[in-house]
Regions:
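Cell-envelope/extracellular polymer assembly enzymes that use nucleotide-activated donors
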Residues: 28-30, 55, 209
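A conserved acidic beta->alpha catalytic loop
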Residues: 60-69, 87, 117
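Acidic helix N-cap motif at the loop->helix transition within catalytic regions
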Residues: 40-44, 65-74
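Acceptor/aglycone-binding surface of glycosyltransferases and processive sugar-polymer synthases
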Residues: 85-104, 109, 121-204, 230-241
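Hydrophobic helical membrane-anchoring modules
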Residues: 2-25, 200-363
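Short, well-formed alpha-helical segments that are part of the catalytic scaffolds
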Residues: 16, 36-51
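Short hydrophobic beta-strand elements that form part
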Residues: 30-34, 57, 84
């Protein structure tokens, strides 16, 4: 019996199959597993992968434990393909290499799963369903959708993720998401194919930087609720050494997004609000500081002086808040992968027609 997605409310009875519900075993879903120091877990992760998954790409990221060789030798699952990288490229580099391999083999949806057995594969249908139904281009887990989901998560991680989530909202433009560092993700292959040529961060900033590049494509991103899960893995992430680099990269992406979205690719009401609001706020602050620097000891500010500084500041803050509101309400809502798929199919059809119309040059 083939695995299918659960029918939606109002679906026809079981006696008549609804063709709008995609069959998972025919959906072309591939799993990509970056492998670095996961030899003790990788076999269990592969064994738990559902039968409806078409293929599994294990990417040995120059693993000192030779995880790739271990999988080749010990795992009999015929769906498994092992890719070995000559040099360590980080989780991002390994994931992108896996994407490329799966796309070359005809994958339609790509799911990234860590090899440390932290991710509950029972959530795979929920992760791929919005993509298969044409509702989203990229989905990711969100461990903060319920208080019960973060029970057992260390307090440091909770606070860190809250801070990173807010920073990611600013730098990526996806105000509708949370938990940006969650590595349990799925993406449509046509969207991933475009990202392969982008300068995406290869290491721990990968998931957040990927969101930034998805934002430049206006791809639709959706959170999938799931609980936190921790096994006996040892994290390779050193929090103290990544805070400043992460902050710098968020600031860089925010600046690039502001320039790209509001000055290069578009010029709209939010652009004017940023320009006028920023200038008004700067003028009000400068006016107040200038008076403070020249005032006599004990001299009180006149009503005109106060209003001359306060009014521009108030107007500037209000305009900037309106610009933020515009940014929040213009999160992408129209998936791009149906368009990309149609363009690709049309190009392939035109190519076939051109070949068939070409004169026969055989002697």
């Amino acid at each position: 019996m083939s695995t299918t997605l659960a029918p939606a409310v109002g679906a026809p009875p079981a006696s008549g199959r609804d063709d709008t519900i995609p069959r998972l075993d025919l959906a072309g879903v591939w799993v990509v597993i970056p492998c670095y120091k996961v030899r003790s877990h990788i076999g269990r992760v592969i064994a738990r992968t559902p039968d409806w998954i078409t293929g599994i790409v294990c990417v040995d990221d120059a693993c000192p434990e030779h995880s790739g060789e271990f999988v080749t030798r010990e795992v009999a699952d015929r769906r498994v393909v092992v890719v070995t990288l000559a040099e360590n490229q980080g989780v991002g580099g390994a994931t992108l290499a896996g994407y490329g391999e799966a796309i070359a083999r005809g994958a339609r949806v790509l799911v990234k799963v860590d090899g440390d057995d932290q991710m509950d594969l029972a959530h795979l249908p929920a992760l791929v369903a919005p993509i298969l139904l044409g509702q989203s281009d990229y989905t990711k887990g969100n461990r903060f959708s319920s208080q019960s989901h973060i029970q057992g998560m260390p307090s440091v991680r909770v606070l860190g993720n809250i801070g990173l989530s807010f920073a990611a909202k600013l730098s990526t433009g996806y105000w509708n998401i949370f938990d940006p560092t969650n590595g349990f993700t799925a993406i449509h292959a046509d969207v991933a194919e475009i990202l392969l040529s982008r300068p995406i961060a290869r290491r721990y900033f990968f998931e957040t930087d990927l969101l930034y590049h998805l934002g430049t494509l206006r791809a639709v991103v959706r959170d999938i609720p799931m609980p936190a899960r921790y096994a006996d893995e040892i994290s390779n992430l050193k929090i103290g050494s990544t805070i400043l680099p992460f902050a710098g990269r968020h600031l860089r992406n925010w600046a690039r997004r502001m320039i790209g979205d509001y000055f290069v690719r578009d010029f709209n009401i939010a652009t004017l609000e940023v320009l006028v609001g920023g200038a008004s706020l700067a003028f009000g602050i400068a006016h107040a500081l200038a008076w403070i620097s020249v005032r006599l000891p004990g001299q009180a500010a006149s009503a005109g002086m106060v209003m001359g500084a306060a009014l521009p500041i108030i107007i500037g803050v209000q305009l900037l808040l309106q610009a933020i509101n515009y940014d929040v309400t213009h999160t992408p809502t129209q998936p791009i992968h149906p368009y990309l798929r149609t363009v690709k199919q049309m190009a392939a059809t035109d190519k076939l027609r051109a070949l068939s119309a070409a004169p026969d040059r055989r002697d």
